[in-house]
UniProtKB/Swiss-Prot annotation:
Pathway where this protein functions: Glycan biosynthesis; glycogen biosynthesis
A single MF term (Gene Ontology): alpha-1,4-glucan glucosyltransferase (ADP-glucose donor) activity
Source species of the chain: Jannaschia sp. (strain CCS1)
CDD domains with a match to the protein in the record: GT5_Glycogen_synthase_DULL1-like
Name the UniProt record assigns to this protein: Glycogen synthase
Catalysed reaction, written as an equation: [(1->4)-alpha-D-glucosyl](n) + ADP-alpha-D-glucose = [(1->4)-alpha-D-glucosyl](n+1) + ADP + H(+)
Gene3D superfamilies: Glycogen Phosphorylase B (3.40.50.2000)
Family: Belongs to the glycosyltransferase 1 family. Bacterial/plant glycogen synthase subfamily.
Function: Synthesizes alpha-1,4-glucan chains using ADP-glucose.
GO biological process: glycogen biosynthetic process
Record has Glycoprotein as a keyword: no
Length: 472
C-alpha cells in the first residue's frame, strides 16, 4: 500500500470547473481498489458543501491570515480541507472574480495550498503520513520548494492537465511567498525573470505525468509546449503519459437516471427522439451531431462554424451546449436562427449533457489541442461516435475509421488532420457516408460501447508509479 497526498485546486463532486475535478475526484476510488490510500487536499471555497472536520494542522499566518487543515470524509472521499477564509471564502469563481478577471492574489492563494501540502507531508495529518505527494497543475507546483524548505524528502509527482497555465508572478513576491531566493534561478523556479509555479513543480518532481501519451510527446514541441517545451525536454526521462478514465457508475447508459436506459445500439433511438424534441429539432435522415464544450477557439468552435454546413446540407443536425467567448456564442445563436437543423443552448447543464451523450449519433471534439479529453470517452461509453481532431488524448483514445480499421472491424470514430476547417468539412462528409452505411455504422457503435474507458488500466499505471516513487 502506498499512502498518497493528492493536492489540487478542485475535486468533484465538491467543486468543479472542468475535467481536472473529475479526475481528482475519481482517482482515490480507483486507487483504493488496488490497495493505495489517497487523501485529497483542496481549498475550502465559500461554495464548498462541507463543514466541520478534525483539525490536523494550524497556521497562525498563512499568507495573510490564520488557517487550518481539516480532515473529513465526504461521499467516500478522504479529504483535507484548507480553511483559509482570507484566501478562499469569497464570492465569484475559483480563479476569477465576478467580472471574469483573475483574482489578484492567486499567487498567494495557491502558494498557500502548496505550503499546506508540504506541511502535511512533513508533519503528517494526525497519525497519517504520506509516502508520496501527487500534485495537479500549477496550483500545486510550489510543493517541492516548500518541501525543500522544511527539509522533507517525501517525493513529489506532478500531473500536467493543461500546460497553458503556468502560475507565473513577479519576482518581487519572493519574500511574500516565503521562497528561497537562492533557488530563484533557471535550474529551479525562475522563468523569464518571473516566479513560475509550474516550472517549480516540473523541476522539483521525481516524476511528471500528463494525461495522454500523445500529449506527453506534444508538450516537448514549441507548438504545444506553451513555453515550457524546453523544460520538458530537459525532464523527458521523468515524463510519461497516462490516459484519464471516467467514472463508469456515473456514466452508464444502462442505469443513467437522466436518460431512457439502454444496453445496445437499438436503445439509442428513444433517446435521440427525446433529445431532438428538447432542442426543437424535427426528425432528420442524417446523423445528429452533439457538442458539449467551452465555446473557445481552442475547442475549435470557429472551425465548426466554417465546416458544419456539410453535415447540415446532407440531412444531418447539430445540437450545441456550452458557453465561452461572447463572439462565438453570438455567431452560433445567429446561425441557429437561420438553420432549422442547428440548435444552440448557451450555458452548462450536467443532466442535459448526459441526455446529449445518449441521444446523439456523433459527439464533436474539434479541439486544436486536447491534453486528454473526457468528452470522447463519454461518447464511446454511450455509443455516440466521436469525431475528433488528431491531437493529444483524442489521438490515443479514438480508433479512426480508416479503410484498414474498418476492414478489421475495430474503428470507433473519425479523426481529422490537419486541424483546419477544410479537414473538418471532409470529416463531416466521411461521417455522413458512414452513417448511410447502416451495417458499418452499427458495427462501429458496438465497438465504441465495448471500449475500456474506465480507470482500471490507468489506475494500474499510477499504482506502479506510486510504488516506484514512494519514500522507502
Amino acid at each position: 500500500m502506498t499512502r498518497v497526498l493528492s493536492v489540487a485546486s478542485e475535486c468533484a463532486p465538491l467543486v468543479k470547473t472542468g475535467g481536472l475535478a473529475d479526475v481528482v475526484g475519481a482517482l482515490p476510488g480507483a486507487m483504493a481498489a488496488l490497495g493505495d490510500e489517497l487523501r485529497t487536499l483542496v481549498p475550502g471555497y465559500a461554495t464548498m458543501p462541507v463543514v466541520g472536520g478534525a483539525v490536523v494542522a494550524a497556521f497562525d499566518d498563512l499568507f495573510g491570515g490564520p488557517a487550518t487543515v481539516d480532515a473529513l470524509t465526504h461521499e467516500g472521499l478522504d479529504l483535507l480541507i484548507l480553511r483559509a477564509p482570507h484566501l478562499f471564502d469569497r464570492p465569484g469563481g475559483l480563479y476569477i472574480d465576478a467580472f471574469g478577471a483573475d483574482w489578484p492574489d492567486n499567487a498567494e492563494r495557491f502558494a498557500a495550498l502548496s505550503y499546506a501540502a508540504a506541511h502535511v507531508a512533513a508533519k503528517g495529518a494526525g497519525d497519517w503520513r504520506a509516502d508520496v505527494v501527487h500534485g495537479h497543475d500549477w496550483q500545486a507546483g510550489l510543493v517541492p520548494e516548500y518541501l525543500a524548505g522544511l527539509g522533507c524528502d517525501t517525493p513529489f509527482i506532478l500531473t500536467i492537465h493543461n500546460v497553458a497555465f503556468h502560475g507565473n508572478t513577479g519576482a518581487e513576491k519572493l519574500d511574500a511567498l516565503r521562497l528561497d531566493p537562492d533557488r530563484f534561478n533557471a535550474d529551479q523556479y525562475e522563468f523569464w525573470g518571473q516566479i513560475s509555479a509550474l516550472k517549480a513543480g516540473l523541476m522539483g518532481a521525481a516524476q511528471i505525468t500528463t494525461v495522454s501519451q500523445t500529449y506527453a510527446e506534444e508538450l516537448m514541441t514549441p507548438q504545444f509546449g506553451m513555453g515550457m517545451d524546453g523544460v520538458l525536454r530537459h525532464r523527458r526521462d521523468a515524463l510519461t503519459g497516462i490516459v484519464n478514465g471516467i467514472d463508469l457508475d456515473v456514466w452508464n447508459p444502462e442505469t443513467d437516471p437522466q436518460i431512457t436506459p439502454y444496453t445496445t445500439f437499438k436503445g439509442k433511438a428513444a433517446n435521440k427522439a427525446a433529445l431532438q424534441a428538447e432542442f426543437g429539432l424535427s426528425k432528420a435522415p442524417g446523423p445528429l451531431c452533439v457538442l458539449v464544450s467551452r465555446l473557445t477557439d481552442q475547442k475549435g468552435i470557429d472551425l465548426l462554424l466554417d465546416a458544419m454546413h456539410v453535415v447540415l446540407e446532407r440531412g444531418g443536425q447539430v445540437a450545441v451546449l456550452g458557453s465561452g467567448a461572447p463572439d462565438l456564442e453570438v455567431c452560433l445563436l445567429e446561425r441557429a436562427d437561420a438553420e432549422p437543423n442547428l440548435a444552440v443552448k448557451i450555458g452548462y447543464d450536467e443532466a442535459l449533457s448526459h441526455r446529449m451523450m445518449a441521444g446523439g449519433d456523433c459527439i464533436l471534439v474539434p479541439s486544436r489541442f486536447e491534453p486528454c479529453g473526457l468528452t470522447q470517452l463519454y461518447g464511446l461509453r454511450y455509443g455516440t461516435l466521436p469525431l475528433v481532431a488528431l491531437t493529444g488524448g483524442l489521438a490515443d483514445t479514438v480508433i479512426n475509421a480508416s479503410p484498414a480499421a474498418l476492414a478489421r472491424r475495430v474503428a470507433t470514430g473519425i479523426q481529422f488532420s490537419p486541424i483546419t476547417a477544410e479537414a473538418l468539412a471532409n470529416a463531416f462528409s466521411r461521417l455522413c457516408d458512414l452513417y448511410a452505411d447502416r451495417k458499418t455504422w452499427t458495427a462501429m457503435v458496438r465497438n465504441a460501447m465495448k471500449q475500456p474507458v474506465g480507470w482500471d488500466m490507468s489506475a494500474s499505471r499510477y499504482h506502479a508509479l506510486y510504488k516506484a516513487t514512494a519514500r522507502k
